[in-house]
Structures are given as C-alpha cells and as structure tokens.
Amino acid sequence: MDSGSIAWMLVCSALVLLMTPGLAFFYGGLVRRKNVLSTVMYSFISIGVVSVVWVLWGYSLSFGEGGNAFIGTLNNVAFMGVEDTDTQIFAIFQMMFAIITPALITGAFCERFKFKTYLVFLILWVTLVYAPIAHWIWDTNGWLYELGALDFAGGAVVHVNAGIAAIVAAMLVGRRRNPGMQSNNVPFVVLGASMLWFGWFGFNAGSGLEANGIAVNAFLVTNTSAATAMVTWLVLGMIHTGKSSSVS
C-alpha cells in the first residue's frame, strides 16, 4: 500500500469512528429527556469496549490466520503477528465497523435495557455473532466468501446483521409503554444525522482499501444517495402533513 493510500485509509477509519458518536447524538435526540444520557452512553461505550475486544480476540476470530470456513483462529490474539502496515490498516478499519454495528442495535431497545446488561450483551454479541459473520463473508476462508458472496461496505455484515439483532432484541424487551413519545432534542437528531452523513464517506469510500477510482465513485454515490433521501423525506413530509420536518 503506497503512502497516499495509507493516509487515505487512516482518514477513512477516523471518519467511520466519528459515526458512532454521531449515532449517539441521533438516538439521544429521539428519546425522552430523562433517558438521554443512558442512550448516548450505549453508543459511546461501544468505542471503548469493542476496541479492546477487537484487539484482544475479535480480529483474530474474524480474520485470524489459518481459520476454517466458519471461524478464525486465536493465532492473532492481542494483534500478535499483525505487524506489516497493510494488515494493521485493515485491522484498524475493520475495528471501526465492529464498533458501530452493536451501537446500531441500541435504537431497538433504548430506554428499556439496563446499562450493565448492555455491557455483557456488547461483549458477547461482538464475540459470538459479529466476528463469525465477518469471517464468513469477508475472510477468504469463509464459507459465504467461497460461495461468491459480495459485501463491499457492510451491507450484510453490518446492516443486515444489526437489523436482525435489533428485531430480536425488540421482541424480547417488548413494546414501549409510551409509543407516541416525542423527540426531546431535534438539533441533536440533525447533528447526529450530519455526523453520520459525513462519516459515511469513510465507511463507503474506504471500503476499497485504496485511494483510487473506486473510492471516488463510492464517495459520489454516497453523497448523491444521501441527498436524494433527504429531498424525498422533505417532499413526503410536506405531502403528508403540509410542512417539512427533520423528524416527523
């Protein structure tokens, strides 16, 4: 990897990391005022806990040398053997994906989950669910990779994975007592959405792992898609309610 691509991937990794506090603001602005801090911490603590888990064993279970079709190995525990620059860059970028994925799930159970319980869930889910699925699809030994599965920027590993987990979590914790609650802080929601939009340039454009034409195309498509979604939301809101709104 040349110096330009190294710099690009470091920037993209930082952009993806920025998405997690952005998600914290986004979710925090949607819940009731008394639950803002706990909701924000759900996302924010993922940065610390998942970073440690990823370095100690998460990366090794996902991409460890000598893995089989279903799981990696413990050959790279604590990043042992992760010495060359290209591998380190890849491990860092993948760590940012692992951080935001469980944070996405918290929107399904915010206000209804004890923080200590969430910490246990966070460690177990990244270890037992995220790492194996990342291995299946993104590691060259993974069984889905061998079948030709394509996942350029986490559509399956991150979003489908988190979505299914969110559905299961919502079913387990049950319905909200007050499903019609209003957002407590719309500026938080807008700030969070803006940070997510900005971070997505790193998420998508960095997934080619190189500063090249693929990155440029991904950057352009990402911005165009987000802009189109914004305009569509505003138009539908005006049709439905007669006014535009950031939230509903």
What does each of the following model-derived ranges do?
Residues 1-248:
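Hydrophobic alpha-helical transmembrane bundles of multi-pass membrane proteins
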